[in-house]
């Protein structure tokens, strides 16, 4: 045996020699441990090594191991200038879009960004990353990204990296724990390998890369050099070792035979008193109901698995709490954990759903309690006073005012008032319709395709609200004046040179003798065409005559463009000192001290200096939870009614509780909709009036008789009579959303807003994009005139509603002709003519998938759902005006779209039911189509559910109960 151990020792010595040679090879590559840089001296030395390597070596490797919580990321490594924070090199992980961003300064001094595709690394598990920066001594730079030892992406022919400053003390190395946008998880290692191969870099992070020929030959050569002199000796020793094992095997066999004879003799000897051994499973040592099986191993038995709903080793079992492990019930508090199982309590009041109970975590995860809202307004015959408004909300309902045409309240009842049908004569024009106002007055409005004051109406070819010829109106109403552009919509009637021809149809709008297509100041006379900069705007109309600024943006409207204005927002603080350069904030409040003022900070309470907002929902990524219980587009942490959809977030008394879930909106002590102890309902729900004075006993208090929301705009002209925050249609303030932000030839839309925000023009043949207003709505009526003012294009345009973020919105879009999209990657998309209504719920967000899905006429799984399409399959006509009317009631999922050509309705979606978005913002949409006009835009708050919805609601309830 001693000789055998000697042979084994010799073999181990040989193997250790090989391992030692490999280990020595690993140490040949210089490595900088970034996490170990503790003082300035160490940092300077590291920068000097790195700077020399970037000049003399071909490759440098960034290596790290880390953990990231779901959807979080940050900067992994960065090289910055200590004096001005200039980036030399920065590597950041963008987990929400599964990308690694590499930013570096090129030799020409400009910042270059490379987006590299990465698998999901934000899952809470350990991850390894290697970034190879190659081609350092060549004309072009190359990048290779390895995630968990596999090549994830690469980029070739990149511009070279700029040299680091000669003075190493000017450069600061920041790791993910010290960067501005720090890593949100934990970082175990962060190293820089200076030179070497991918295999050697992999060896430093325990990544056994295969196929690296150079590394393989090095190791193989070393093994041969070490084993070459010992091969014969090693073979001889192994032969001896094999002989010893054979002899040992024979000895063991003899011992087994002898022990068997002794055992049989003992068992057959009755005098010894041995008896049949008792069963280890009697009595059953296992948990009640668990099977027992005898074994030869200690303790002589083995228990089966614990019963369903329990966990343990079979001997001891304890109950599993399915409520905490799986949360199967509609609300966490409704789950009751029982011995071996769980039971869900009944659905909350105002909701309906089948009972649910079961056993085990797997069952609880695969079966969820479903509770659907009961529409008391439909199911309860007398939920509210007859002829009053009943508003269904999730789990309940509330009673509003009397319906249009009735007067009174919930206590006294609602009685008929003067109405259009009860009039002894019709005061409206034959081409107009009667409209009942909130206060009971009657007014007239011209039908679509006609314009005037309602009492007198004339033909309106371009449907912009002005008649083709002037009308003899008694009140000299402005909409009785002749349209200065009969065939091109221009609801603002702009006429720069006052020649009676509107700017939209005037070939020389400013009257300077130079045609618009050649004029560098289309609306300002400038015969000399002087242009001191290079932005295509002449000095006479350029708000920055000596500084190029294509967008001519002027945030503070002081006549000086942002590009040359040292105080862009006009708050008295210069841009270089202003923590919100484009939003007035003279107090400069900055609660999270991230250098961005609260007035413009997308996360005012959490530091986020980069202000990234991937999904364009106006909430920064670092504080964006995407948890929205009621689906109204506001995450629960920012929602003033987290369980009731209320996109408008109206809070009339500023008590932090939204009006839709506040029993006393104006905080005057009078309940809004129900009488409590003889008090209420409030006859002025939004204006404090404890005395409830109502001189004419019409059910509306004196203080809100003609201005219900007290916003100084009479209800007759107020587009939202029950919201003091919205008074007129206005898109002058809007958010631009680019739906395909990456591409070879990126052309973004150019939006021009006219007529005080009631007309929008898009001039470019652009990539898909949106212009979205900042006002969010619950129920809304949205209408406008659509006109393509060109004959050279045939693509898509339309309007949007229910916008919550760049992955969640509704779009009404129209294509002129059938066409296959010219980029077949990631999939072939076919557009068809005809008006379409789509619900966008995109898993990927802005990019090539959403782009092709919008172009495609049908459904695209995980991206876009087609809700309705005009069966006529008719495209829009060049230079032809159309009027669309849209109604959306998100509380019940009601959607209806109507389209008019002239005065004739040519398309009607009928009632469409969809609850993908429970409210949101409004805007317009374009995709590869130029010269689009959205004119005479109007929106109006309206939560009243139309009568044509009732039959659809019954069908929905019947389907749920079955």
UniProtKB/Swiss-Prot annotation:
Entry GO terms, CC: collagen-containing extracellular matrix; extracellular region
Comp. bias regions, Basic and acidic residues: 631-641
Compositional bias annotation for Acidic residues: 557-570, 652-669
TSP type-3 repeat positions: 459-493, 494-529, 530-552, 553-588, 589-611, 612-649, 650-692, 693-728
Segments traversing the membrane: none
Pfam families: COMP, EGF_CA, TSP_3, TSP_C
Biological process according to GO: cell adhesion; mesenchymal to epithelial transition; somite development
EGF-like domain segment(s): 277-318, 319-358, 373-412, 416-458
Keywords: Calcium, Cell adhesion, Disulfide bond, EGF-like domain, Glycoprotein, Repeat, Signal
Disulfide bond entries: 281-292, 286-303, 306-317, 323-335, 329-344, 347-371, 377-390, 384-399, 402-414, 420-434, 428-444, 446-457, 473-480, 485-505, 521-541, 544-564, 580-600, 603-623, 641-661, 684-704, 720-941
Domain (TSP C-terminal): residue spans on this chain: 732-946
Glycosylation sites: 313, 409, 646, 710, 942
Signal peptide limits: 1-23
UniProt keyword annotation of Glycoprotein present: yes
GO MF annotation, one: calcium ion binding
Region (Disordered): 548-704
Annotated Laminin G-like domain residues: 24-196
Subunit-level organization: Oligomer; disulfide-linked.
Similarity comment: Belongs to the thrombospondin family.
Function: Adhesive glycoprotein that mediates cell-to-cell and cell-to-matrix interactions. Can bind to fibrinogen, fibronectin, laminin and type V collagen.
Protein name as catalogued: Thrombospondin-3a
Species whose genome carries this gene: Danio rerio (Zebrafish)
Taxonomic placement: Eukaryota, Metazoa, Chordata, Craniata, Vertebrata
Gene that produces this protein: thbs3a
């Amino acid at each position: 045996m001693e000789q055998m151990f000697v042979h084994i020792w010799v073999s181990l010595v040989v193997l250790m020699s090989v391992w030692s040679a490999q280990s020595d090879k690993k140490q040949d590559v210089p490595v900088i441990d970034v996490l170990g840089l503790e003082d300035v001296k160490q940092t300077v030395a590291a920068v000097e090594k790195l700077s020399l390597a970037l000049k003399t070596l071909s490759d440098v490797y960034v290596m790290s191991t880390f953990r990231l919580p779901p959807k979080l990321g940050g900067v992994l490594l960065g090289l910055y200038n200590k004096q001005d924070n200039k980036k030399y090199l920065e590597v950041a992980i963008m987990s929400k879009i599964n990308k690694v961003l590499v930013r570096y300064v090129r030799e020409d001094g400009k910042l270059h960004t490379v987006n590299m595709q990465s698998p999901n690394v934000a899952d809470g598990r350990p991850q390894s990353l290697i970034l190879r920066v190659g081609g350092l001594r060549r004309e072009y730079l190359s990048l290779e990204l390895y995630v968990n030892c596999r090549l994830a992406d690469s980029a070739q022919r990149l511009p070279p990296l700029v040299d680091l400053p000669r003075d190493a003390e000017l450069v600061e190395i920041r790791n993910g724990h010290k960067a501005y946008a720090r890593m949100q998880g934990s970082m175990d290692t962060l190293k820089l390998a200076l030179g070497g191969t991918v295999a050697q870099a992999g060896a430093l992070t325990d990544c056994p890369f295969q196929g690296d020929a150079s590394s393989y030959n090095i190791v193989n050569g070393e093994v041969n050099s070490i084993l070459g002199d010992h091969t014969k000796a090693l073979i001889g020793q192994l032969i001896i070792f094999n002989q010893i094992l054979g002899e040992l095997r024979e000895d063991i066999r003899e011992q087994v035979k002898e022990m068997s004879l002794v055992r049989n003799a003992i068992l057959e000897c009755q005098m010894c008193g041995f008896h049949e051994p008792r069963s280890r499973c009697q009595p059953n040592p296992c948990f009640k109901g668990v099977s027992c099986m005898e074994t030869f191993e200690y303790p002589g038995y083995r228990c089966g698995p614990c019963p369903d709903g329990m966990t343990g080793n079979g001997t001891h079992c304890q109950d599993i709490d399915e409520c905490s492990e799986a949360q199967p019930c509609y609300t966490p508090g409704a789950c009751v954990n029982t011995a071996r199982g769980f039971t869900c309590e009944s659905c909350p009041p105002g909701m309906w759903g089948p009972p649910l109970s079961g056993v085990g975590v797997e069952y609880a995860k695969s079966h969820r309690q479903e509770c659907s809202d009961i529409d008391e307004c439909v199911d309860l015959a007398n939920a509210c006073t007859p002829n009053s408004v009943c508003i269904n909300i999730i789990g309940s309902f509330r009673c509003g005012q009397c319906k249009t045409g009735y007067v009174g309240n919930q206590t006294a009842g609602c009685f008929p008032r003067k109405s259009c049908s009860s009039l002894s004569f019709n005061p409206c024009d034959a081409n107009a319709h009667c409209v009942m106002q909130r206060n009971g007055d009657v007014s007239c409005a011209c039908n679509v395709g006609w314009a005037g004051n309602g009492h007198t109406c004339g033909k309106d070819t371009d449907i912009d609200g002005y008649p083709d010829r002037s009308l003899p109106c008694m009140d000299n109403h402005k909409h009785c004046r002749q349209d200065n552009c009969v065939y091109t919509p221009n609801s603002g009637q702009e006429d720069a040179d006052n020649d009676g021809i509107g700017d939209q149809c005037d070939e020389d709008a400013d009257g300077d003798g130079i045609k618009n297509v050649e004029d560098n100041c289309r609306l300002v006379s400038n015969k000399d065409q002087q242009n001191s900069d290079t932005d295509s705007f002449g000095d006479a109309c350029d708000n920055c005559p000596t500084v190029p600024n294509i967008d001519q943006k002027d945030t503070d409207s002081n006549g000086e463009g942002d590009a040359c204005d040292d105080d862009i927002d006009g708050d008295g603080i210069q841009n270089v000192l202003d923590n919100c350069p484009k939003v007035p904030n003279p107090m400069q409040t900055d609660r999270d001290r991230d250098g961005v003022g609260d007035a413009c900070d997308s996360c005012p309470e959490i530091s986020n200096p980069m202000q990234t907002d991937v999904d364009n929902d106006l909430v920064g990524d670092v504080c964006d939870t995407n948890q929205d219980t009621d689906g109204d587009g506001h995450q629960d942490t920012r929602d003033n009614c987290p369980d009731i959809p209320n996109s408008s977030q109206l809070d009339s008394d500023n008590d932090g509780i939204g009006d839709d879930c506040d029993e006393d909106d104006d905080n005057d002590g009078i309940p809004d909709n129900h009488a409590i102890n003889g008090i209420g309902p409030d006859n002025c729900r939004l204006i404090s009036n404890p005395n409830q004075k109502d001189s004419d006993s019409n059910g509306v208090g004196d203080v809100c008789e003609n201005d219900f929301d007290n916003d100084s705009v009479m209800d007759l002209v107020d587009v939202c009579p029950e919201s003091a925050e919205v008074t007129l249609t206005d898109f002058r303030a809007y958010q631009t959303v680019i739906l395909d932000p990456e591409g070879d030839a990126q052309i973004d839309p150019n939006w021009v807003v006219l007529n005080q925000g009631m007309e929008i023009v898009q001039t470019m043949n652009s990539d898909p994009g949106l212009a979205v207003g900042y006002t969010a709505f619950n129920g809304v009526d949205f209408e406008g005139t659509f006109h393509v003012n060109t004959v050279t294009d045939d693509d898509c345009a339309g309007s949007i509603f229910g916008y919550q973020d760049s992955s969640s919105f509704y779009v009404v879009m129209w294509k002129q002709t059938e066409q296959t999209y010219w980029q077949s990657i990631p999939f072939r998309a076919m557009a068809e003519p005809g008006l379409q209504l789509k619900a966008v719920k995109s898993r990927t967000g802005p990019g090539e998938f959403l782009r092709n899905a919008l172009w495609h006429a049908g459904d695209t799984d995980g991206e876009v759902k087609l809700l309705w399409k005009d069966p006529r399959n008719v495209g829009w006509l060049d230079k032809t005006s159309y009027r669309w009317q849209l109604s959306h009631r998100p509380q019940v999922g009601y959607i209806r779209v109507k389209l008019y050509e002239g005065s004739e309705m040519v398309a009607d979606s009928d009632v469409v039911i969809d609850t993908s978005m429970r409210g949101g913002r409004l805007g317009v949409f374009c995709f590869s189509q130029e010269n689009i006009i959205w004119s005479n835009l109007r929106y109006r708050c309206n939560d009243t559910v139309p009568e044509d919805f009732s039959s659809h609601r019954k069908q929905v309830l019947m389907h749920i109960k079955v």
